[in-house]
């Protein structure tokens, strides 16, 4: 409804720009809500890391409904971490109404208080599930791809590299969460991240569905990575190297062909009328 109203008031592509900016603002607000006023350095690092997250471009810059839903559910997750269940339920429903597939992210967040051993087991088993299910269904002449959205878009095997990165991150964050003495949200966010990556890995055999699903986990990363960096207690030289590395990573990320193509095509779709009245084919 909001998107429809914006499309009536503003020319393309401004409705999408407004929604994207609103979602980015919500993401930044979540950084402050999930940290205390004493964690100023964590907040600074987290805000600096947001533009380096793939979801910043591929969700908030293209699949806008998914990006908006993911940050709404991030706020729902923060409420749940503080044991405010009614607020969690309300924002979760709102997020699912924005983008129905977000119910998977809601499920992962809702299960973040499960035992650590269960979260690890799910993360380890999930990559094999889709291949086993596809193999079994093929034996019975069942085409699962016809039931999975975007399953027909197969452009290669690059997503397996992405899986390796996210899988390693999930395991690393779970390990770090067991070493933290601070009473913060890190351990719950680590489990939510691992469960979201696990849910995405259930679709690992399908490139685009996996890549779209794993983007939900990105909204959890900036705060956890920032907390990890601050805990390293780096000296001046270490901070210089880290900042330099992040600047180089940011330059490589924002000048990459995939990012430029995503942003250019998304803008073209809006300007030439292919996105009408917020009917976004994402």
Set out the residue ranges of the language-model regions.
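Transmembrane-helix motifs of polytopic, lipid-linked glycan transferases
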Residues: 18-37
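Short hydrophobic/aromatic helix or loop-helix immediately within or flanking a transmembrane segment
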Residues: 1-10
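Signature aromatic-anchored transmembrane alpha helix within multi-pass, membrane-resident enzymes
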Residues: 127, 233-254
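Short acidic/glycine- and proline-prone juxtamembrane loop motifs at membrane-interface regions
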Residues: 60-66
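Alpha-helical transmembrane segments and terminal signal-anchor/GPI-anchor hydrophobic tails
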Residues: 105-219, 258, 263-279
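Transmembrane helices and adjacent periplasmic/lumenal helix-loop junctions
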Residues: 93-107
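Transmembrane-helix signature of polytopic, membrane-embedded enzymes
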Residues: 31-52
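Membrane-interface transmembrane helices that cradle and orient dolichyl/undecaprenyl
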Residues: 73-86
